């Protein structure tokens, strides 16, 4: 299946604007832009609670080649605000694959951006430090004052468990209780 390619923009609080293409959910989002250098483990990254309120960018050039596998998740849901990659694989190849990255992002209302120079954006963040960004289809309407003022709020409350849960083992040897 061939996707319709829609232009989307990453606008950094320092005024830099990067044009890319949209995948995953549609919309607009503000977040703290960070990058990760992992060569794999994108499922774990997407479901890592420490990325709450952040727009996560992968520096590895191709993401999504083994699809999405529920068993590999770090938590029950995704906490990233948006996801940026250089290139993503539309048709993953893995016997464990349950769905593609695009489908996962859509199901979890996460905006994805691909087709941008992640090296240049990473260099900007490395030199200037972590900064806020907005992903939008209309960069002319960005309120840079609002963008600079953005702060991640209620992170701990938002990622903490609200009820007890049990993690079962396939080879049960001991009973462990955490209080």
Put a short name on every predicted segment.
Residues 2-179:
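RNA-binding accessory domains that recognize and position tRNA/RNA substrates
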